[in-house]
A protein has these predicted regions:
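Conserved acidic catalytic loop of the alpha/beta-hydrolase fold
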Residues: 233-253
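A domain-start/cap signature at the N-terminus of enzymes
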Residues: 21-147, 159, 163, 167, ...
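The feature captures the conserved acid-bearing segment of alpha/beta-hydrolase catalytic domains
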Residues: 280-385
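Fungal secretory targeting signals
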Residues: 1-29
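Active-site machinery of serine-nucleophile hydrolases
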Residues: 158-239, 283, 287-291, 380-389, ...
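Primarily recognizes the serine-hydrolase "nucleophile elbow" in alpha/beta-hydrolase
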Residues: 245, 253-305
């Protein structure tokens, strides 16, 4: 009798555990709920974000990755998207190394792109600073009407990101209403390499390198030492100015600074700190699935009791001394002037509805939410409860059935429309 009770207790416990596991696996927005959010986000981003915050498991930090259950595009970036209409897909180039160990070399030529190692972004006496970048193999500057500066993610693999953009470009050409003409789009990706890449042999003498991922928040150059004052955002300024220069590109209509993941964070950080200029009417930003957001006020959806630094840059604007020198001057109390400029810029956000990976796991990020999709929804939703509100210059796509995947997000129709056209 005792054995029977013990067996029964174990069976009930196992059944309960299995039920919990099934519940965890299924705790996410259903395809129907995600489709509703996708549609609502086009007209009312704040209401759509509030719907996301009703998804089962959205506040659970121990969720299994939703990508394993409901993705419509697999779980990576090594295949064409279902909506490609037969567009050709090119695999990514390769090198040896990782973002932690450093790279042995930079791929030279692939797909429709090549590596340019001759761009001098700054001079100081006899010293020069060169930033290698990837760009179209062939183009006529007089025919270029649009340029996309694609910032890499944490792995610093600009070659991969630009190859994915090239694949997305071919998908865009399959949609006649987008009118993406051949030879009119210049695609390029700067490199933001690490000191460890220099030690492994990937970087040459005068080529700039940074320390770890500091470049994503506006950190300064580590090498060459003559340029230790130069911010990664100064480098982006150089690219933007070059592309908007009528002497070099007489028919340029629009330049877009774009990025996904850490590249998305970089794009947002740059949009927040860059000065507003007369040329900004021709400048746009695309922010895809950043791991955290620059909050526009001091509120946070989760406790900050054990995180007094929660408002520091790049998680907020309220700690003046934490703002990089690049954008500190004239930022105003709590960054008010930078925030005013940010709200005027043309920015498009992309949020994957299966992207429940943690992203940064420090207390400043965790005060914003438990995952990337949770942080995105909280950041959008709080703008409905603040004086800033949702800017008319900002748009957003909530992407169903996609997780933290570079290519499906870049190749999503709404992203293609923003990157390759000026259609509203």
């Amino acid at each position: 009798m005792h054995f029977t009770r013990t067996w029964l207790s174990c069976a009930l416990a196992l059944t309960s555990l299995l039920a919990q596991l099934v519940s965890i696996a299924q705790a996410q927005g259903s395809p129907e709920a995600q489709a509703t959010v996708e549609d609502l986000g086009k007209s009312d981003p704040i209401a759509a974000a509030q719907k996301i915050l009703e998804f089962p498991g959205i506040f659970d930090p121990d969720q299994s990755l939703w990508a394993s259950d409901a993705n419509i595009t697999g779980t990576g970036d090594l295949q064409q998207v279902p909506w490609s209409r037969g567009a050709f897909f090119t695999w990514n180039p390769w090198t040896i190394g990782t973002y932690k160990t450093g790279y042995l070399w930079l791929p030279e030529r692939f797909n429709m792109f090549k590596l340019n190692r001759s761009l001098v972004v700054s001079k100081s006496g006899d010293d020069i600073a060169i930033d290698p970048f990837y760009v179209n193999k062939h183009y006529d500057p007089e025919k270029i009407e649009r340029a996309i500066i694609l910032i890499p993610g944490q792995w610093r693999d600009s070659w991969k990101y630009l190859n994915l953009l090239g694949n997305a470009y071919r998908v865009a050409q399959k949609y006649p209403e987008l009118n993406v003409g051949s030879g009119k789009v210049l695609m390029l990706s700067p490199t933001f390499m690490d000191e460890v890449d220099r030690k492994r042999g990937a970087m040459k003498k005068n080529e700039i390198t940074f320390q770890k991922a500091g470049w994503s928040a506006g950190d300064t150059v580590r090498h060459p030492r003559a340029f230790k004052h130069m911010s990664s955002f100064d480098v982006l300024d150089f690219y933007v100015s070059m592309l908007l220069d009528r002497q070099q590109f007489p028919n340029m209509k629009t330049v877009t600074v774009a990025g996904h993941s850490m590249g998305g964070q970089t794009s947002m950080h740059y949009a927040m700190l860059r000065d507003l200029t007369d040329e900004d009417a021709r400048l746009k930003y695309w922010v895809g699935n950043p791991g955290s957001y620059v909050w526009l006020n001091d509120t946070r959806p989760f406790s900050t009791a054990k995180c007094p630094e929660y408002g520091e840059w790049p998680y907020g604007m309220s700690v003046h001394k934490s703002i990089p020198r690049y954008g500190r001057k004239g930022s105003g109390k709590n960054g008010v002037h930078r925030i005013e400029n940010f709200l005027k810029r043309r920015i498009h956000f992309s949020v994957s509805l299966d992207d429940n990976g943690h992203g940064p796991e420090n207390c400043k990020a965790n005060a914003q939410g438990v995952s990337r999709v949770c942080r995105a929804a909280e950041w959008v939703a709080q703008r409905g409860n603040s004086t800033e509100g949702w800017s008319k210059s900002h748009t957003i796509d909530f992407i169903p059935g996609v997780s933290h995947q570079d290519y499906p997000v870049i190749a999503y129709y709404g992203t293609l429309k923003f990157l390759f056209t000026d259609q509203e």
